[in-house]
Amino acid sequence: MVETTLEERGYTDLHEHIEELRAQGLLIEIDREINKDTEMHPLVRWQFRGGIDEEDRKAFLFTNITDSKGRKYDIPVLVGGLAGNQQIYQLGMRCDLKDLKTTWINAINNPIEPNVVDSADAPCHDVVFEGEDLLNGNGLDAIPVPISSPGWDNAPYFSSSHFITKDP
């Protein structure tokens, strides 16, 4: 059972969520070089298809990523960090499992207006590549998207993206 309360968590972004996973012992950090095309997902699938009980599953944070062409990435990849098991999901939703349905219904029925921030004050900005710039490795291949089924998928795909939002 996750031991922090909603008031204690109060984290504002994915970095803080990762810190909470680490503090709760729900994160396995892989710092050795991992090939995103051949090694990343088989390692993660091992825990789901290898007979590990759900409560013993962990999130994986890969920090030293390469691909089959030798390209190195400076972006870490978190896999299973939002819903690897019920404890991880509960931690991210910031509510008890028994309250998940009510929490989702409340969030869907009570959307909040976006908080518009002046571009100069924004903590992050879009980086947009168009036209010929996409041919120089700045398209989807600039992001270390793993290949889900090595040997079967011919490229990385965004098949089930997650969105990080904040519920006031």
Where are these regions (language model features)?
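Extended, highly charged
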Residues: 1-168
